[in-house]
A protein has these predicted regions:
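Terminal, low-structured helical/coil segments at or just beyond the last alpha-helical repeat
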Residues: 18-21, 38, 79, 83-112
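C-terminal structured "cap/appendage" subdomains that terminate the fold
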Residues: 67-68, 73-84
Length: 112
């Protein structure tokens, strides 16, 4: 397996991929929380990168769903947020399933 050398030592490609996906999602989510609308377009790119690296993370999908909604793409937001709910169900995480479902309902009602 490919190893990447960084300040923390040698990381496997999988570790490096997960680290970068988490960083990208965290940056995007911080913009969602800050409500800095002028940064939504850039945050959307970070969220898309995170989901590109981990297509099944309910957390990453949730962030992406929020940002599609906030950038005016309600249909895409519903599609992605539905995947977040399904992913949370598959992880058998009731609290995450509840929160992602709540967000999905708010998106559908235009109340996010």
């Amino acid at each position: 397996e490919l190893k990447v050398n960084n300040s923390d030592g040698m990381l496997s490609w999988s570790d490096y991929k997960n680290l970068n996906a988490n960083l990208a999602n965290n940056v995007a989510w911080s913009v969602v929380e800050s409500k800095e609308t002028n940064l939504y377009a850039q945050a959307l790119k970070w969220a898309e990168l995170a989901v590109g690296l981990d297509k099944n993370s309910p957390y990453f999908l949730d962030t992406l769903g929020h940002l599609y909604y906030f950038t005016g793409n309600k249909q895409k937001a519903i599609e992605v947020q539905t995947k977040a709910v399904e992913s949370a169900k598959s992880e058998q995480n009731p609290s995450l399933e509840f929160s992602t479902t709540s967000v999905l309902n708010k998106i559908k009602a235009n109340k996010l």
